[in-house]
Amino acid sequence: WVGLTVVWGFVFYFIKLALESFEPVQVAFGRCLLGALTLVLVAAVTRTRLPRGRVVWIDLAVVALLLNTLPYLLFAWAETRVSSVLAGIWNAATPLFVLAFGLLITPWEKVTREKLVGLAIGFLGALVVLGFWDMGNGGDPLGSLACIAATACYGIGMPYTRRRLVHRSEPAVSLMS
C-alpha cells in the first residue's frame, strides 16, 4: 500500500512538471497514450486477444472517458491553477464519490446507515484536510472545481465498470487494452 501511495502521490508532481513544457491537453494525451501502449504491449506479449463486440467496445469507451480521458485532462488543467499538493488532496475524495455513485449505479449495493455515516465522516474529514473554509489561500476555485470534477469522474467510472464489465469472461488485460 505504501508503494501505491507513493506512486499515486507523485503523479500530481509529475503532471505539474510536465506542464512546464506541455499544454494540459498534451499531458493528458501523453498519459493516455503511454498507458494504452503499455497495455497493448502486455496483451501482445501474453497473446491476449482484444474483446469483440460492439456493446463491449461502447462500454470500454465510456470507461476510458470516465477513468482516463476526462480526469487526466481535468487534473492537468487544474494544476495550471492549483498546486500539485492540493490536486492530490482533492483526489483523496475519490472513495467518497465511488461510494456515493456506487449506491446509485449498482442496484445490489444497499444503502445502509453505516455507509451513510462513513460517507458523512469522509466528507467532513475531507473538508477539514482541505480547509474548505479558507479555500482562497489554496489556489483558484476553478482549479479546485476541476479536481472535484475529475474525482467525480472516477466515482462514476468505477461503479460503471463494476456494473458493465466485471462479469465479462475476457481477461482484464484484454479489457484494459
How does the language model describe each region?
Residues 1-29, 77, 137-163:
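Glycine-/small-residue-enriched transmembrane alpha-helix faces in small-molecule transporters
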Residues 1-3, 36-63, 76, 80-81, ...:
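Membrane-interface interhelical linkers
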Residues 3, 29-34, 62, 66, ...:
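Hydrophobic residues within alpha-helical transmembrane segments
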Residues 7-15, 40-91, 124-129:
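Specific transmembrane alpha-helical segments of multi-pass solute transporters/efflux pumps
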Residues 39, 61, 93, 100-101, ...:
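Hydrophobic transmembrane alpha-helices of multi-pass small-molecule transport proteins
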Residues 39, 98-100, 122, 136-177:
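Transmembrane alpha-helical segments that form core, pore/gating elements
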